[in-house]
Amino acid sequence: MLIKTEGFVLRNRKYGETDSMLVIFTKKVGKINAIAKGARRTKSALLAGVQPFSYSDFVLFKGRSLYTVNQTEPKEIFYNLREDVKRLSYAAYLLELVESVTEEGQTNNRLFNLLGRTLHLMKKEEIELETILRAFELKLMEYSGLKPHLTSCVSCGQTSSNSWRFSSKEGGLICHQCHGIDSFSIKINVLTVKLANYLLAKDMEEIQKLKVNPYLHESLNKVLKQYIMVHLDRVNFNSLEIAKKI
């Protein structure tokens, strides 16, 4: 059966001498594994459309356990990202996140569109990269059914507290009276909570130039790092570690 769909290449690895094994996040059939035969040959018609980050139109043949790329036409290669190692590393982190959170064969158009908009924004020199990354992380978790609860205590429902903490295990805020339910919870201030809620509520185009205090960035980053680690069951993202060293 032939399927026509657009998609983002999340991963491309060498398979044999001339083939590529791909992980593609498609709009029509979700995340899939696919083989692109002969794609590593320099004159292959498939070469440009199967590079990591490529946003391409695909004609796919669905086999018993694997898709085959019959045709592909790149729509966006994101050359600007490839010319800046830090932006490239952050963009690769987005792809790692998407691959980690999605199930094979399950579509998620909100996440698909979010990835496209974010990669396009990351091409711009004037954007606040850290702000965009935090917004993407929050929205990715929301669109995957893992939105953190940030409006009241997840245990008792209290909407005000002398001292808030964030529990990754419980999935959100815990007030000062409920701190004991999670010994690994992280202290979080009201401004960080407000920032997280703002990033969840606004679209990426509104967020792109938002300047945030470095302390708030670090505070939200600490919370989200633990939250993602717990819910995606993943400790490290290689591309993010590379970006931090640059």
UniProtKB/Swiss-Prot annotation:
Disulfide bonds: none annotated. Keywords: DNA damage, DNA recombination, DNA repair. Transmembrane segments: none annotated. The keyword Cytoplasm does not apply. It comes from the Bacteria. The keyword DNA repair applies. GO terms for cellular component: bacterial nucleoid. One of its GO terms (biological process) is DNA recombination. InterPro entries: ARFGAP/RecO, DNA_rep/recomb_RecO_N, NA-bd_OB-fold, RecO, RecO_C. Involved in DNA repair and RecF pathway recombination. Belongs to the RecO family. This is DNA repair protein RecO.
